[in-house]
């Protein structure tokens, strides 16, 4: 079974085309006009072993908010579509990732119930032109559209770049684990019989 998706989203604010292969090798081609987000999505693909292509244009002359949030929406939709009925997947994943002085942990449940817990303290600063508060908007949009329960916790860290990079890497590794198919699982990993 091919676990791939291609999603296109066109609004008055953004134009996004995204293709995803869950069972990839970590190849990425990302061009969002938001350099820091490009960096995060490239490492997300690499560390999750997802093949990911993203082309995005947005009203970045205003700010990056719409573009960042809409990419989160589309990535969530693509993951959900590629997983289909979730037959045989592990459902749960978790990863703890160090990045120099930072330690971040992510746990995910592909339950069909969207809920984000975001314990990440960041000063209101920019990395380049990227407002770091937009990271939460991205994760919330991803969570809602994937319909997943996502917990992101940063135990400690000082460098804002390192904090967000550790979060994206931990998310990638947790999703890689949760989306893996296990031959021991008949149907879905739920006593209800549906996720």
From Swiss-Prot:
GO terms for biological process: L-histidine biosynthetic process. PROSITE patterns: IGP_DEHYDRATASE_1 (PS00954), IGP_DEHYDRATASE_2 (PS00955). It catalyses: D-erythro-1-(imidazol-4-yl)glycerol 3-phosphate = 3-(imidazol-4-yl)-2-oxopropyl phosphate + H2O. Its EC number is 4.2.1.19. Belongs to the imidazoleglycerol-phosphate dehydratase family. One of its GO terms (cellular component) is cytoplasm. It is an enzyme of class 4 (lyase). Pathway: Amino-acid biosynthesis; L-histidine biosynthesis; L-histidine from 5-phospho-alpha-D-ribose 1-diphosphate: step 6/9. This is Imidazoleglycerol-phosphate dehydratase. GO terms for molecular function: imidazoleglycerol-phosphate dehydratase activity. Keywords: Amino-acid biosynthesis, Cytoplasm, Histidine biosynthesis, Lyase. It comes from the Bacteria. InterPro entries: IGPD_sf, ImidazoleglycerolP_deHydtase, ImidazoleglycerP_deHydtase_CS, Ribosomal_Su5_D2-typ_SF. Pfam families: IGPD. The keyword Cytoplasm applies. It is found in: Cytoplasm. Coiled coil: none annotated.
């Amino acid at each position: 079974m091919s676990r791939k998706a291609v999603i296109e989203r066109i609004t008055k604010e953004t134009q996004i085309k995204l293709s995803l292969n869950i069972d990839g090798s970590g190849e990425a081609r990302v061009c969002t006009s938001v350099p820091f987000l490009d960096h995060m999505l490239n490492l997300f693909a690499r560390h999750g072993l997802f093949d990911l292509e993203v082309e995005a244009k947005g009203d970045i002359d205003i700010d990056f908010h719409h573009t960042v949030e809409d990419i989160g929406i589309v990535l969530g939709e693509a993951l959900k579509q590629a997983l289909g009925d979730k037959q045989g997947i592990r459902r749960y994943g978790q990863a703890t990732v160090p990045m120099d002085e930072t330690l971040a942990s992510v746990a995910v449940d592909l339950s069909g119930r969207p809920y984000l817990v975001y314990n990440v303290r960041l000063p209101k600063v920019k990395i380049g032109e990227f407002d770091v508060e937009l990271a939460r908007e991205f994760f919330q949009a991803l969570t809602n559209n994937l319909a997943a329960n996502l917990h992101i916790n940063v135990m400690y860290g000082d460098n804002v770049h390192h904090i967000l990079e550790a979060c994206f890497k931990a998310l990638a590794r947790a999703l890689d684990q949760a989306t893996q198919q296990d031959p021991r699982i008949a149907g879905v990993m739920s006593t209800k019989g549906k996720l």
